[in-house]
């Protein structure tokens, strides 16, 4: 959310250069989800007319880690995933873009089912004492919290994602299992409670009208 900082000279390139210089020999991950790569019957903003659903199913571009743009995440994740030294995982709906140490191995291990759960990039982040960085954002958009949702045996639902093209030129779809990532709206409440009780596990600095926060993932 660079807009929260008013003006950053160089835009997302400046941000990424600062991160890579600071992290140096570590690993950086950013969400790079393709939020429309799902069954058009489930779209809500806006919903699809019933007579157009099958047409979209037959023609929606399937996921490509190189060409499929991120959606709804802002300019920084979109810029990050296009960099030549960044790899992107193959999950068709919830891929992660990764730079640095072990990036290929981390990307290759992301499972189709429960893509934010065990063996996912978030699992690697958790087990290696990773940190979460908020750049003008808050807990409402904290992707790392989905790791908790995915590892506490919550019920799953069947999802669809476009993954290829058949011999007739129509889009093919793949089913996978995932928890409902939108069923709870309490991430900010959880984050506020965490900061009030465990202030030793996060740091923040003000930058113009917003904050940069660094939070330890495992305690959160």
Show where each model-derived region lies.
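N-terminal and secondary-structure boundary signal
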Residues: 1-220
């Amino acid at each position: 959310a660079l807009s929260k900082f008013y003006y950053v000279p160089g835009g997302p390139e400046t941000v990424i250069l600062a991160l890579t210089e600071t992290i140096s020999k570590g690993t950086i991950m950013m969400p790079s989800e393709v939020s429309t790569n799902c069954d058009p019957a489930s779209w809500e903003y806006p919903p699809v007319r019933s007579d157009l659903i099958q047409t979209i199913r037959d023609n929606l571009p399937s996921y490509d880690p190189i060409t499929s743009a991120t959606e709804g995440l802002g300019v920084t994740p979109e810029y990050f995933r296009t960099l030549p030294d960044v790899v992107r995982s193959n999950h068709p709906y919830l891929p992660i873009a990764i730079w640095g140490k072990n990036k290929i191995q981390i990307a290759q291990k992301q499972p189709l089912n429960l893509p934010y759960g065990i063996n996912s990039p978030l699992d690697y982040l958790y087990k290696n004492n990773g940190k979460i960085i908020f750049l003008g954002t808050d807990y409402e958009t904290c992707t790392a919290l989905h790791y908790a949702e995915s590892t506490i045996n919550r019920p799953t639902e069947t999802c669809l994602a476009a993954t290829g093209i058949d011999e007739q030129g129509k889009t093919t779809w793949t089913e996978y299992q995932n928890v409902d990532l939108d069923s709870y709206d309490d991430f900010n409440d959880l984050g506020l409670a965490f900061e009030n009780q465990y202030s030793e596990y996060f740091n923040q600095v003000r930058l113009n009208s917003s904050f940069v926060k660094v939070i330890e993932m495992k305690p959160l």
